Amino acid sequence: MESFNVVETLQPAERALFWVGALITASLALYVVYKTITGFRIWVLGNGDLLSPKLGKWAVVTGATDGIGKSYAEELARRGFSMMLISRSQEKLDDVAKSLESTYKVETKTIAVDFSQIDVYPKIEKGLAGLEIGILVNNVGISYSYPEFFLHIPDLENFITTMINVNITSVCQMTRLVLPRMEARAKGVILNISSASGMFPVPLLTIYSSTKAFVDFFSRGLQTEYKCKGIIIQSVLPFFVATKMTKIRKPTLDKPTPERYVAAELNTVGLQDQTNGYFPHAVMGWVTTILAPIDLVLNLGLRMNKAQRGGYLRRRKLR
């Protein structure tokens, strides 16, 4: 009995379509398998002991006294790094430094500066002199007090300057100070904390969103420049984390504590040049940038932020 071959019964045009469909199906299947394996490596296996003082004795964290920055300092100290903490309040810096020394038995140093001022970098450069820096976490950043239309932002001229100095200039200048010695030793890690707000425009948070898009592009460009020299530069784009800045008090699965977020994010270093840092955030990033049309994302953002703006102004009777 002769075997029946479906392909041979098709007309030439139908046969071509059949093979195109088969090729597309096979490609999609391979893509799913690849992404599954890659995801397992990133979110389950992690990067092992990549982040250790073998990179360099010291880790530097800006904005190190609260939220995500403080959690980076704690986690890196737990891994054995001596910590250089840079933030505005010397009192808060001293409190965090004492806690790290007591809990993790590591050496600490502090530099108190206001990153909204552009004349602070000679002081920072002097404080960093002679340190073997393995990791730099560019975390310091500011956002809006509440969502607002561009022309209605109080003290707009100063707001623009301050936002750029803290969110953009600090990243560039700190990288300028630290990267040369990393390049000379052919190893080092720079983590630039951007935001999911930098993945797409966010109406009523437009300046903040734009500064975070800069941080993302800056990080990815530098990684391409310096990856071949043994240096890792990663763009980190978290969604909401339960911190003072976000005003989220109760953590949830999609709004984790900073400790939980940082522990997850550090496992992605060396595996992703651009990361949302935390699996639920990675899913949210895929939905907002790949699945959902950008116009829908923009309109939803506008509606949500207008509602938050209205609530803020009503509470303060400013509307």
Curated annotation (Swiss-Prot):
Its EC number is 1.1.1.330, 1.1.1.62. Keywords: Endoplasmic reticulum, Lipid biosynthesis, Lipid metabolism, Membrane, NADP, Oxidoreductase, Steroid biosynthesis, Transmembrane, Transmembrane helix. It comes from the Eukaryota. Signal peptide: none annotated. Pathway: Lipid metabolism; fatty acid biosynthesis; Steroid biosynthesis; estrogen biosynthesis. InterPro entries: NAD(P)-bd_dom_sf, Sc_DH/Rdtase_CS, SDR_fam, VLCFA-Steroid_DH. It is a multi-pass membrane protein. Substrate binds at residue 195. The chain crosses the membrane at residues 17-37, 188-208, 282-302. It catalyses: a very-long-chain (3R)-3-hydroxyacyl-CoA + NADP(+) = a very-long-chain 3-oxoacyl-CoA + NADPH + H(+); 17beta-estradiol + NAD(+) = estrone + NADH + H(+); 17beta-estradiol + NADP(+) = estrone + NADPH + H(+). It is found in: Endoplasmic reticulum membrane. The keyword Transmembrane helix applies. The active site is at 208 (proton acceptor). GO terms for biological process: estrogen biosynthetic process; fatty acid biosynthetic process. NADP(+) binds at residues 56-85. One of its GO terms (cellular component) is endoplasmic reticulum membrane. GO terms for molecular function: estradiol 17-beta-dehydrogenase [NAD(P)+] activity; oxidoreductase activity; very-long-chain 3-oxoacyl-CoA reductase activity. Its main location: endoplasmic reticulum. Belongs to the short-chain dehydrogenases/reductases (SDR) family. 17-beta-HSD 3 subfamily. Catalyzes the second of the four reactions of the long-chain fatty acids elongation cycle. This endoplasmic reticulum-bound enzymatic process, allows the addition of two carbons to the chain of long- and very long-chain fatty acids/VLCFAs per cycle. This enzyme has a 3-ketoacyl-CoA reductase activity, reducing 3-ketoacyl-CoA to 3-hydroxyacyl-CoA, within each cycle of fatty acid elongation. Thereby, it may participate in the production of VLCFAs of different chain lengths that are involved in multiple biological processes as precursors of membrane lipids and lipid mediators. This is Very-long-chain 3-oxoacyl-CoA reductase-A.
